[in-house]
């Protein structure tokens, strides 16, 4: 199939060569010459050309600047409303939709149409990549020809395309929008991620772990991932995984994934266990704000693997022999929507109702006596019902978590009230909870994200496993100095359970507290985490890989020694390093860092150097998600 474009390009080159030959060697003397074009003849030709619609529209477009592209703000700190570009064209009829693909290894800015390169390696890499097929992009559009332009719909569509796993960036442009006409043309521009990916997460003489993936197989909006691990002290020594994903099945906006793994990387039930899993999942997110139905379904069957070769029948054995099935489904209905077709949004919130059913059932439980009363190894079922009010607008910006790519930021509020019923270890409890989240901009273009939540379970008119959670995040304005850019990040997170029953105590290890803390025995039911990070977005680039340098300060307190949180020591971590990523590639970010812990608890050392990979973090732009209990981890 790849040879057909090559033949086409070859034919075009022959035609261009013939044209160039004709220009260089004009007609010979014995050929009948053309008549000279006088002034009156040129005026007549100009009059005739103005009668042609195509030429007339092109002429008017040049003098009225109708096809001016959305201004690029890649190097600016401005946060721009997503629908602002489309609002002046609200209500106009869509005549034609055109599609344009920007090469993966092309311009870093999708608006750049003048990019050229003579590097043969770049051309080879682009030829090896299957561009997303036009029908895949067309299936992902919310609009069609002969419909009227809705600014919110177009902004949602652009954001949906940009958040597809196989697309790096996307833009929707208005074309031929004559001020005197009620119709216009649309151009959809997309830039793919390079489809091939690979990761070597572990490599030593006794342990090798790697995977390869393709996030847009044959350009058909589908992904495939295959992984393996060989470890000499495991039984069996070889373990594998495979996952297939089809995005937006038949234009339904449902993503379907299916696969298996014996690498213990699909939500293991407990710590110090090793599991294998078969699974299938379907997910239909709130892909646009006017979507009525959202939901998802997961079916998984997991089992323990005796990876260390322990004796399962021994009472003191670390191996737990079990097998269980999870059935998890949720659905939501967006029944009040206040986004207007003219590109404006009122002060009234939108309303949605959501429901969820979760059932974890064991086919085989561990034989050890000490696990019989552990709630983790008992059947667990719950039903949830949630009412949600939200008013969210979306903005576009750069240089938050990325290396220059367009990032979508939700601004507004989300309030949810949840109730439910749970059956776990022969206890049937009612649940109630409330959670509120708000994003807002400061006058200096800083961004706040606040979250507050309270919840509890009810049994015999008494509360248990109550949770109180508060979180504050601050992102400063992007500060630019020549080609350098800086941004400051601040976080404060407080979590407490005053009456735990099933809950296990908190810790401050890794993401739960301080990066670099592992296997500490600091546990409690109240925790306060604080963090500060300064990021320098370097202009330095090597073979497409960009560098972000950072310094960080982490602080954590936990009620491990005293029930009064403020009477416990403050554990600190000071560090810095850099992150490296090529945003054209479907690879995780490489992080190189070093940390110093002045009062490190046992068994943490005072100094740590680390090279690891981290996943690409993005703002959660979906207003509606699966109902869940307030997390206590």
Give the role of each language-model region.
Residues 20-463, 474-633:
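Immediate N-terminus of the mature polypeptide
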Residues 1-8:
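Bacterial N-terminal signal peptides that target proteins for export
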Residues 15-17:
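N-terminal signal peptide c-region/cleavage motif recognized by signal peptidases
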Residues 467-468:
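Amphipathic hydrophobic-ligand
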